[in-house]
Amino acid sequence: MITKQNDKKMMESPRFNIRVYGFLIDGGKILVTDEFRLGILMTKFPGGGLKYGEGLIDCLKREFMEELHAEAHIISHYYTTDFFQATTMLPFESQLINVYYLVKVNKPYLFTTTEKKFDFPEIIDGAQCFRWIPVNALSEDQFTFPIDKMIVGRLKNV
């Protein structure tokens, strides 16, 4: 809820956490990433945080190169968060804004996938693996974060 006190606080030091994600869909399946970061096991879509000085597409391309060793080709913008969501993973208050794009990646894929959730050699910070999930089998409970959970219903219509 926006109040005069909150409004004044945000005007003094607005903080936004902007995350950019790609939906890579192939053969009716969508790529997800299982990760262990900041002491949390999480399932989300490939992508990550915007760095100062980056554009949204540059961020997504960097994230795909870092995570998947693949160049993301943007097909289209899919969704940008249009409601308030507080960031829960940072040690300070900020507003989370997620931006999602439909993407393609050249084949053959250079990344490996698994069928088992959290299929890491060991659970250490930065552990990551990728899985394909049939789009028609997506459900909110497969994802960790509120905005990803919300977007799942929309994806079934892609």
Language-model features and meaning:
Residues 12-16, 42, 91-97, 122-127:
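A generic structural micro-feature
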Residues 24, 102-104, 131-134:
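Short, well-ordered beta-strand micro-motif
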Residues 85-115:
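Active-site-adjacent beta-strand/loop module that shapes the phosphate/pyrophosphate-binding cleft
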Residues 29-66, 70:
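Conserved Nudix-box catalytic region and its N-terminal flanking loop in Nudix hydrolases
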Residues 1-23, 27:
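Acidic, metal-coordinating catalytic segment for phosphate/diphosphate chemistry
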Residues 71-80:
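A short coil-to-beta-strand element that immediately follows conserved catalytic motifs
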Residues 5-12, 87-91, 117-120:
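Short, P/G- and charge-enriched loop/turn segments at secondary-structure junctions
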Residues 40-43, 110-158:
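Nudix hydrolase/Nudix homology domain
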